[in-house]
Amino acid sequence: MIRTSFKHSIETRNQLLHRRHFVVAAALTVGNFVFGRDARLADAMDNGELHNKNEDYKAKAEELKEQRLRSIANSRPMKPCYEGHVPLYPHERVLLFITSGLKSYFHPEDGENIVQLGEASAFTPFLERLKNTMLSDKTGRRILREQPDITSESLDMDRLKKMAPNTLGHSYYKWLIKEGVSPDTRAPVKYIDDPTHAYIFKRYRQCHDFYHAVNDLPIIIEGEIAVKALEAANIGVPMAALGALLAPLRLKPVQKKRLYDVYLPWAVRTGLSCEPLINVYWEELLEHDVEELRKKLRITPPPDLRAIRRERAQQRKQFKLKYERHE
């Protein structure tokens, strides 16, 4: 009797355990189905794969992106007037002028600072005067009408390489190779509102290397200051005038002496006496004899800055050797 009762108790316990395992397994299965489904739903929602199966999620995302861009555009003082245009409020322009000016002074090696300062200081009266200078000249009017771009492709660098050594094109090509630069490195204009003014400033910026090449001035700091002074005297670029006045303050005494004695007087004299360089259609003069072109533009190149620096370095080297022998 006792044995039968004990046996019955064990069977009952096993049934309960089996039933509990079944319930737990069922609960886990249901939980995995429910919560796992929730996790899958969350992933699907995040991937845009849910809700209306006929809805194009990519199109929706693109629409949201466009809405954000429109909201940013609506926060500007005007709609962009040309590709890449970033309209600024007056206080933003003042802030850009101050910050880019300070950064240009302390970090002149960063071209982005110079680019921003150039546009922040490109005041409307200056650009309007430059436009009138171009409109008063036959070639200047044609440049404004045609609005050419100076790029490696438009100039055809292989063609320049094969030109006669005495041509402007070959001289320009040699200068580019020597200095390790390209016509394509000029930044686009962003912060000037009027499209015509923006093109004029872009044209000035793209012609900058021709001013270097026709005068054989390197892109080292002294050469850049000399070209900036030339641009300030000839074209009246505010940023160029600021650079010519302030940049020499950070130079070594020997560099300052060269600039103040030779290159700045040359730049101011040449800039005031030569033809308006903004009206020169450089692309059409590539096959011209560079010496004849200089005479036509009334430009006399300055002394060779590279040669002067090499001579100075050689003198220092000889002086150092002489000093070491006497020690």
Curated annotation (Swiss-Prot):
Keyword presence, Lyase: yes
Q: Which Pfam families match?
A: Coq4
Q: Where found?
A: Mitochondrion inner membrane
- State any GO BP term from the record: ubiquinone biosynthetic process
Reaction catalysed by this chain? a 4-hydroxy-3-methoxy-5-(all-trans-polyprenyl)benzoate + H(+) = a 2-methoxy-6-(all-trans-polyprenyl)phenol + CO2
Q: What else is known?
A: This protein may be expected to contain an N-terminal transit peptide but none has been predicted.
What's this protein's name? Answer: Ubiquinone biosynthesis protein COQ4, mitochondrial
Q: What is the lineage of its organism?
A: Eukaryota, Fungi, Dikarya, Ascomycota, Saccharomycotina
Its gene is COQ4
